[in-house]
Amino acid sequence: MRRLKLAALMLCLSQPVVAAAPPPPGTGIDAAIAAPSRSADNVKLDESRKPAEVLKFFGLRPGMHVIDLFGANRYWAEIIAPAVGPKGHVLVWEPTQFYKPDTKTAFEAFAAKTPNVSIISTPFEAPTLPRNSADFAMLNLDYHDTYWESQKYGIPHMEPAAFLKTLYAAMKPGGIVGVIDHVANPNSDTRATVERLHRIDPEVAKADFKRAGFQLVGESDILRNPADDHNLLVFDPKIRGKTDRFIFKFRKPR
């Protein structure tokens, strides 16, 4: 019996070792962030924006069709386009008020070498997005601007509900909207706070999206900063790039 056991053991040891199957390929987010083709100015923002953690939290995957709102600066598009791959697509929407000639030139050069990227530019007060088209939308540090008006920049008084109605219609059932914005103190006058500080109370943003029909399916503290007391303009050098920011993950019901 002992000889039989020994023979069986030797037979097992003589068999070739089969390597464990490699894990399924990831989203490509890390590789996209490390790509040398990214603009140097955008790479500098990574430390404060933590794009890998953010996009993984939102669930970005290859093949997704993405809307990058206010995205002509290319920060997110440079990462998302390679991450979603050739079967995915990134549609950037940029308000005409912000789509200045230098921004347009830089974006067109980027799009010329990135075949899965395109752009739509319409007035801020009249966003145009293809209906039922997006698996994911990124809204980074700009939702508060739907409460903003500026004679200098040609931005009229707007109703955030109208903006969200357009966004809701653009999302596929089950589509995810990732919202990041600068935190304002609670119970403040939203329009006055946006005008003065370019911040928004997280509960206001949350309520707006819920009224528009979206479901809140996740929150993250990746970009929270307890040292920010929410009283400085977000462009103030003392806090710029270090503001306390909320992250909400909304879904259009299936």
Q: Can you say where each PLM-predicted feature lies in the sequence?
A:
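Conserved Class I S-adenosyl-L-methionine
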Residues: 189-216
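Class I SAM-dependent methyltransferase Rossmann-like catalytic core
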Residues: 29-57, 61
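A short glycine-rich, Lys/Arg-flanked "PGG" loop and its adjoining helix->strand segment in the class I
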Residues: 81-82, 154-173
